[in-house]
């Protein structure tokens, strides 16, 4: 920004400042050996400029999903939740186009069995599942179908999937805001994360 000389002779400088952001997202993976995690599957961007936000520091908290705004064609839905603000459970040290990354400091909220990570050539079109929370803190697996795999995609959107689970479709309409980062599992392995929803068809992303 450049200063401007006003009519009264004074010099003025306008500045748009945003010092913090908060939102609901989903943890993609946690490595108990290192305490590291990845989440969101995409970066945190400024809501006005769509530019990646520079990060000085950040934290993650547990969230209770209280309500769901169901997605419809042309109108993306949303998970609405309350943060457990009594304590942070980890730090955010990296905000990148591939997601946010950091360290989990209190893993008491994490449960489930460990899975291996698939090699890119092992991912294929067909049945799969995503893990997400659409009520309270209950994380469940929901059925999806991988329609297309494009490992050479330059925008990081390496596959196209469609939600096929009747319960998830009934409750959310498909993929909604807040599900970003939901792990995609196929053949017992982690193959990716949900990153975006197709606005024209919320069942796909």
Where are these regions (language model features)?
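C-terminal recognition in membrane/secretory proteostasis and scaffolding
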Residues: 1-205
